[in-house]
Amino acid sequence: MNRIYRVIWNCTLQVFQACSELTRRAGKTSTVNLRKSSGLTTKFSRLTLGVLLALSGSASGASLEVDNDQITNIDTDVAYDAYLVGWYGTGVLNILAGGNASLTTITTSVIGANEDSEGTVNVLGGTWRLYDSGNNARPLNVGQSGTGTLNIKQKGHVDGGYLRLGSSTGGVGTVNVEGEDSVLTTELFEIGSYGTGSLNITDKGYVTSSIVAILGYQAGSNGQVVVEKGGEWLIKNNDSSIEFQIGNQGTGEATIREGGLVTAENTIIGGNATGIGTLNVQDQDSVITVRRLYNGYFGNGTVNISNNGLINNKEYSLVGVQDGSHGVVNVTDKGHWNFLGTGEAFRYIYIGDAGDGELNVSSEGKVDSGIITAGMKETGTGNITVKDKNSVITNLGTNLGYDGHGEMNISNQGLVVSNGGSSLGYGETGVGNVSITTGGMWEVNKNVYTTIGVAGVGNLNISDGGKFVSQNITFLGDKASGIGTLNLMDATSSFDTVGINVGNFGSGIVNVSNGATLNSTGYGFIGGNASGKGIVNISTDSLWNLKTSSTNAQLLQVGVLGTGELNITTGGIVKARDTQIALNDKSKGDVRVDGQNSLLETFNMYVGTSGTGTLTLTNNGTLNVEGGEVYLGVFEPAVGTLNIGAAHGEAAADAGFITNATKVEFGLGEGVFVFNHTNNSDAGYQVDMLITGDDKDGKVIHDAGHTVFNAGNTYSGKTLVNDGLLTIASHTADGVTGMGSSEVTIANPGTLDILASTNSAGDYTLTNALKGDGLMRVQLSSSDKMFGFTHATGTEFAGVAQLKDSTFTLERDNTAALTHAMLQSDSENTTSVKVGEQSIGGLAMNGGTIIFDTDIPAATLAEGYISVDTLVVGAGDYTWKGRNYQVNGTGDVLIDVPKPWNDPMANNPLTTLNLLEHDDSHVGVQLVKAQTVIGSGGSLTLRDLQGDEVEADKTLHIAQNGTVVAEGDYGFRLTTAPGNGLYVNYGLKALNIHGGQKLTLAEHGGAYGATADMSAKIGGEGDLAINTVRQVSLSNGQNDYQGATYVQMGTLRTDADGALGNTRELNISNAAIVDLNGSTQTVETFTGQMGSTVLFKEGALTVNKGGISQGELTGGGNLNVTGGTLAIEGLNARYNALTSISPNAEVSLDNTQGLGRGNIANDGLLTLKNVTGELRNSISGKGIVSATARTDVELDGDNSRFVGQFNIDTGSALSVNEQKNLGDASVINNGLLTISTERSWAMTHSISGSGDVTKLGTGILTLNNDSAAYQGTTDIVGGEIAFGSDSAINMASQHINIHNSGVMSGNVTTAGDMNVMPGGGTACR
């Protein structure tokens, strides 16, 4: 916009014209004809003026000259060519009452023409008419290059044409219009043209300007106007394009105060780039009425409305119009900015149109307008501030960031009332931010929308008691490119709207935290349309309430047509009438209720109405279903997923809860109910509601935790037990299994428990199809309750069926169901084997009872027998389909034993065989055929059909080397000796070793397998010796002998847990071997002689009273020392088991590889005796590591979990390289501790004692009072020891040596001498 006027002579019209380019918002350019003097020089001569007049086309007439201290009074009618007052000197012209001065030509009149001149014209009741004889207005320069003053008082009247105050650089012009009926009329009025101009209208004085009024016309000029005390300035005629300019290129200021009045058309403040304009409207009854207000057009403009001042705007206002401009409006102290127009088109305000704009309303200021937009164009930046009680903006809509950047801050009980649609971030480039704080409020009334992020970016932040209230809908992220964010930040803040749509077509985010409240009692939509994405986070005791007493929808919909996400965390609460997740077929919705006291409360819950919906209840979050019904996958093609804990495939999490629900129903789509939680307690996670729905695609997925189904569920589809434990506690005799009619798959890590807790009187028949290779456990209310399968179960289950309290018949459908499965018979289970071959995957005995339909004597094969791939009849672990199971190898086998039956073997047991073969002799009827056999069967008890044990019928004394050392019980028993199944045989059942005697087991030359195994139970108080050239095994887990176990030669293998009974000592001779074979054994004391070997093979050995190991320990597993001292001598390089040292127990080492590469869990005492080298084991626990007997060891393991204590005795040394080598342990140092570190290390450990500390390496070691408590010598050989505290560290070391390249720094008080060697030093850090 060009506000530089060019004055030209129009020969046709015979007038001067002032031409300017007035750019309108509609893009038009207009020219205003203004009469203007050509006298632009700073100093004039009469010749120059005459030339100018000649050039103007008029004959020069007589001019009135008042100069050289003249005073001229006019009180009659006069006419002059020009009035020249104060040409070079001082002149005063008084036009008194009765005086009527006029012009005869077109000459310019001047008051204060040249430098140092001073002219004054006083119009005191007279009239001065500056029009020529043709009634053409003529120029008047007041303060051309000198000082000029025009005073209009006492009803004086001046009819001016083109009036310029300070018309040239250095000129100072002043016009004072004072008193009622004192009048100045102008056409074009410049106040500060090139110099300085002042206009004062006071005491009801009256001024008019009919073409343009300018304050501060040219750069460097200054124009000041004061309208006060009833004074009035009228800047207008019938042409609405007339302009009032404050600071065109110079500086202008207009002040309206004490009842002053100004009426103007278009008002421009800070018109050009160098222009600075200020408009002040202050005091009661002070008013300016304008048509359009441009504040900061190209330059800088400021409007101050204060102390009840009033601006009336007939049409719109722009603040910060063009790029680079700056406009400010301050409405304060009950000031009022009022827009008079009717309709939105003529009442709007742009704060930051293309430039920078500010609107500040405070101290009961008031703005009444149409739509207010902050940041209109892309380059525009607008800031609105409303603060203080009774400070109010009332408008027809508020837009922040239309295409530019808009900000609004409402605080300290300030109020914005928008009676029309409002937006933040309207266009794609628009950014709108609103902050409502400290009791501020924004009200959006009537049936209009509020949109946060229409196509741009919008942010609404509410905190410290801020409030937002809307009587209609609020959108966040309306169009595809829109991004809207709402932040509610504390308990005193609230957001009230009829409805909220978060992510309509764009992206919306709502964060409600710290006890804040969001009310949307009509509805809440998250992800409204296809491209929409919405996220709502309700956290930290905050509330989103969609419920009222009215009959409105009160719906919460997450993923309407787009993508929605609702996170309720850390005590957040959401309340709705009905909640729907993923309404339409392409929508996606996710709801997460996470944390204690986090709550989603709804009447009914729909997860996956037609789209893909997920509800996750985790970490004690709660879903309260007041209507009782939860629907998953309501219509096709919906997928509705309800997660308890975590989603399928994720890491398990603490479970959430569902209250007041009566059912979870799978709909016509795909319903998925996932249990993936961390509740592994015996009580488990209780599910009381009914799971129902005839959905072939429905799924119950169990991934982790222990879950209990208590209802008689009727759902179809699938039950997938992938991991964890699913307990079915409800069943009926008519086939209601608690898993409906679903197909059940138990994956390898998964476990399905079938209990009878809700129906103690009934049997249980599994009518479900069963697949997978995991574990199914059955425990009914008592052992006499029948468990069985049906034909529907199929033959695909390949896992383990672990039967506890139950009765089971192995025939027909039951046998078929276990075709590929392992049958594990536990205590209180009775399984009857019917006639014929019953072929199943495997049989494992764990305390149960198997009844065979056969008798003895009989044929070699029972009438009813079992065929298996794997038979497990020994104590210990077995592996089935890659999963490990633990059994005790015990149980009862019932057969028909005639009474009496006289067996000739009972009179003469075969005793000519090796003792190790006595348990396997006289093999009779085969009960089980097996491809693979684990265990000897020696722990099984043979009983008759009445349950009575088939007792030994012969006891023999067993003598060795002429001395009776034991007694042997012989009779019918069970054996796997042939290696292909389970048999009834007649042989040795038990051995009882006499106290004080030793029973030696040695296989017959070359014997192996069953012929070198003792499966009979070994008891008694005597000792057991193994003396073999090859190997002897013990396979009875019921052994309970108390004497010592001597492995004198060869190998002892333990094939069952507890095979060593209650032995008081395990003593292994030179070259002898003990093979734990993965089993668990306990001994009182342990003696491993030089040259002996213990093969752990992932087994466990517990030593209760210590001992000594001089041989080799090898393999992985566990060595548990629970008491006494176990001395381990020598190295065990192939040992990698975990060594656990209990409190009150000790392990001592004389070699750094005494415990190989295994970890050490030390809660007792680990003693290093005369050990040198690198200790690479990782140590954990809270015990003690003691370095004694001139030990010198470098700790290289990761000991970060060790919180115990390192003790260094006098003459011993420990060294470390990294912080993890010391863990979090303390150090009692009476020897030498060497710390070699290349990195900085802030040591927080306690180091005490009388020993020395040596610092090596280039790193910085920082000590505190605890780590500097040792009293010995400190040698800083390399790097730096620093003392890292603001207060001085008390270093107890008695002597400090700082070697070459060593440094000591920090704030420290030393207890002894300090020796700084050449190259060493100290420093202040």
Curated annotation (Swiss-Prot):
Subcellular location: Cell membrane
InterPro entries in the cross-refs: Autotransporter_adhesion, Autotrns_rpt, ESPR, Pectin_lyase_fold/virulence, T5SS_PEPC_rpt
Lipidation positions, renumbered (N-palmitoyl cysteine): 19
Keywords attached to this entry: Cell membrane, Lipoprotein, Membrane, Palmitate, Signal
SUPFAM superfamilies given in the database record: Pectin lyase-like
Domain of life: Bacteria
Covalently lipidated residues, kind S-diacylglycerol cysteine: 19
Region forming the signal peptide: 1-18
GO cellular component term, pick one: plasma membrane
Protein name: Uncharacterized lipoprotein YdeK
Source organism per UniProt: Escherichia coli (strain K12)
Gene behind this protein: ydeK
